[in-house]
Amino acid sequence: MHASSQIRLTFNQDHPAEHEDDSSGIAVQESKPALQAPPMYKVVLFNDDYTPMDFVVEVLETFFGMNRELATKIMLTVHTEGRAVCGVYTRDIAETKAMQVNQYARESQHPLLCEIEKDG
């Protein structure tokens, strides 16, 4: 029974039934929309005069998965230049990371500020 159905389908594809409107004989395939990469956002830490450097290193290790050496380097950039990029992510992830850092800083009673900026 199954083989018979396959043969019929093949036959019907070669010769459309009378009720099908296929008079042009042209095969049409719908085009797929072009996919674009989502816009990326930088997560930026800002310097302040009160947050301890060790706390900034802890934040970078905890929320951005950095090792101690890289976290210390980024912390020193924040300290000397006033700001540093911690990572570049899609908008939802960047917003979540910035919110988590700001919430953790407030819970720890530090004024550390983390924001996002559109990359590019």
Curated annotation (Swiss-Prot):
InterPro entries: ClpS, ClpS_core, Ribosomal_bL12_C/ClpS-like. GO terms for biological process: protein catabolic process; proteolysis. Residues 9-32 are annotated as: Disordered. SUPFAM superfamilies: ClpS-like (SSF54736). It comes from the Bacteria. Belongs to the ClpS family. Binds to the N-terminal domain of the chaperone ClpA. Involved in the modulation of the specificity of the ClpAP-mediated ATP-dependent protein degradation. This is ATP-dependent Clp protease adapter protein ClpS. It comes from Ectopseudomonas mendocina (strain ymp). The gene is clpS.
